[in-house]
């Protein structure tokens, strides 16, 4: 058995068929989600030697001209639940603080931030948190996302209560932090339906924008053919787009804790049920629709809990 050089070096090793790039993963192997480098981005600078698996000739020939080859497997790091919950708490706190601060600043300073600025602030916060904490907790930041992924077997149900609990706690802490910084202008950050729309319109607006968000998240987070390295940018762009459209009417929540934390701090619970139920239903629908329409793996692989954000 000979191990292929990572960048196609060595005549006897397995080399990539295109431009000397490192070999792809075994067919059907789930791509890392918001959790670090892919298996084909291996370098000599890694601190530990990855595991090497020999393939029979019939399989190896599909990947390399040699009769036998080795495929590098990098196992997902073992992160304790405590660390995951800590990262999820911090990520949710940061998201709620900055996504809510933008409309509060707008209220306090008479439109200092444009509607696009409000949307971009939330989108950039999401991108930043995914890139900084995704490799630890998966950067769910949203109970609707956690529940939807669990329903589709991309995340273990046993961890759902703990994730939702720290998301709620992070949201409430962010709400009171905002109250301390911006009092008495906190009402500008609470998402409530605009008086010009009906309850049904508000409900379906939140349903649709959350559907769109989870359709994108499920694509970049569970499909092996998606460009996982761009997950943070894609999800942040989806959040920005949704808030640009729904911000003037419902606030563009897409997230029960985006509404809950500021509502608790401000004591404003008007139509709160819309922001708890509509995003959750929209999330399950969006994730489910992408799962139904995506291309299937050739080996017919079924979803596994490890596919959800590699946690």
Curated annotation (Swiss-Prot):
One Pfam match: MIP
UniProt cross-references to Gene3D superfamilies, sorted A to Z: Glycerol uptake facilitator protein
Transmembrane portions of the chain: 85-105, 111-131, 158-178, 202-222, 226-246, 273-293
Chief place of localization: membrane
Tissue and organ distribution: Expressed in roots and leaves.
Topology in membrane: Multi-pass membrane protein
GO molecular function, one term: channel activity
Localization annotation: Membrane
Keywords of this entry: Membrane, Repeat, Transmembrane, Transmembrane helix, Transport
Biased composition (Low complexity): 20-34
Motif (NPA 1): 142-144
Assigned GO CC terms: membrane
Family per similarity comment: Belongs to the MIP/aquaporin (TC 1.A.8) family. NIP (TC 1.A.8.12) subfamily.
PANTHER family for the chain: AQUAPORIN NIP2-1 (PTHR45724), AQUAPORIN NIP5-1-RELATED (PTHR45724:SF11)
Note on domains (UniProt): Aquaporins contain two tandem repeats each containing three membrane-spanning domains and a pore-forming loop with the signature motif Asn-Pro-Ala (NPA).
Protein name: Aquaporin NIP3-1
């Amino acid at each position: 058995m000979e191990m292929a050089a990572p960048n196609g070096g060595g005549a006897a090793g397995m080399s990539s068929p295109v431009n000397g790039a490192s070999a792809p993963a075994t067919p059907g192997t789930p791509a890392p989600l918001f959790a670090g480098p892919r298996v084909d981005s291996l370098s000599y600078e890694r601190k530990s030697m990855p595991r090497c698996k020999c393939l029979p000739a019939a399989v190896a020939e599909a990947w390399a001209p040699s009769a036998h080859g080795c495929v590098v497997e990098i196992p997902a790091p073992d992160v304790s639940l405590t660390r995951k919950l800590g990262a999820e708490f911090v990520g949710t706190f940061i998201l709620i603080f900055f996504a809510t601060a933008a409309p509060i600043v707008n209220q306090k300073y008479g439109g200092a931030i444009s509607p696009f600025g409000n949307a971009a602030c939330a989108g950039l916060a999401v991108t930043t948190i995914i890139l900084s904490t995704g490799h630890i907790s998966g950067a769910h930041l949203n109970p609707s996302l956690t529940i939807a992924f669990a329903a589709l077997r991309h995340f273990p149900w046993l961890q759902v209560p703990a994730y939702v609990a720290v998301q709620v706690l992070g949201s409430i802490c962010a709400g009171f932090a905002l109250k301390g910084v911006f009092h008495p202008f906190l009402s500008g950050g609470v998402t409530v339906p605009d008086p010009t729309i009906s309850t049904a319109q508000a409900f379906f607006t939140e349903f649709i924008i959350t559907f769109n968000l989870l359709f994108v998240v499920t694509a970049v987070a569970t499909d092996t053919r998606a460009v996982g390295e761009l997950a943070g940018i894609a999800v942040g762009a989806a959040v920005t787009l949704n808030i640009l459209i729904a911000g003037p009417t419902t606030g563009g929540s897409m997230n029960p804790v985006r509404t809950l934390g500021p509502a608790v701090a401000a004591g404003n619970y008007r139509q709160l049920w819309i922001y708890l139920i509509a995003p959750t239903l929209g999330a399950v629908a969006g994730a489910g629709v992408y799962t139904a329409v995506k291309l299937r793996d050739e080996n017919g692989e079924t979803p596994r809990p490890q596919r959800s954000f590699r946690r």
